[in-house]
Amino acid sequence: LASRRQRQMCIRDRSSGKTILKNCAIEPEIKDLTKFLSQAGANIKWSGRTCTIIGVNSLNQTSHTVMADRIEAGTFCVAATLTKGNLQIKNLDPNIINTEIELLEKVGAKIKTSGNKIFIKGPDKIKPIQNIKTKEFPGIPTDLQAQLMVLMCKSVGKSSITESIFENRFMHVAELQRLGAKINIQNNKALIEGNTKFIGAELMSSDLRASVALVLAAIVANGKSIVGRVYHLERGYE
């Protein structure tokens, strides 16, 4: 996992000798951490998914701006697509969400990029995608799976989402069904009917990404919805 590799990089950087990490995650956050540590004096080299770290005695003071949260940005892009919104996102390298941009364009969103800005306009009708599959970067991130499921519920036809990263990542489905979603789970695949008319309901979030998916669904539902356990949401969204 990316977070595990990040911890290993920080630990190994101060150890003596050479450490080689193989089959590493290559998410932008990993490369951003590499940039920060290198600025501080670390000796880190990459070759594909292999990271070689030569230990150093000490690290120097440095200044570094942490990159934007691509999952948060992707969530807002989904929100704009879902609500026929008109959104501008600043201070984000569009290249880190290229795959997400391509998918949202397929469903009908109009998206333009300029420097570190993204402009997105939601479509009048959301087109279904027959097989969305979560993958490691640069594929569709598992952390956007729940949000995309809400989007597909509002599409004009049938679609499916395959979760290939984590087990038991469909805990939000039962709550979406409370709102009226027609979703059938077959192992790690969700079959989604589309054309859903969400009706407000009391909902319970089970984790960070599920909670924001429920909020998105509630936004486009008829009537009042109450989402419980919002402390999950507060871990990843301001």
Task: Please tell me what each predicted stretch does.
Residues 23, 55, 91, 122, ...:
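Residues on the solvent-exposed faces and adjacent turns
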Residues 13-14, 36, 41-70, 81-82, ...:
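Self-splicing inteins and homing endonuclease
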Residues 1-11:
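Single conserved hydrophobic/aromatic residue that forms the stacking wall/gate
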Residues 71-73, 206-214:
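Conserved phosphate/oxyanion-binding catalytic-loop motifs
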Residues 139-192:
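C-terminal structural cap/anchor segments
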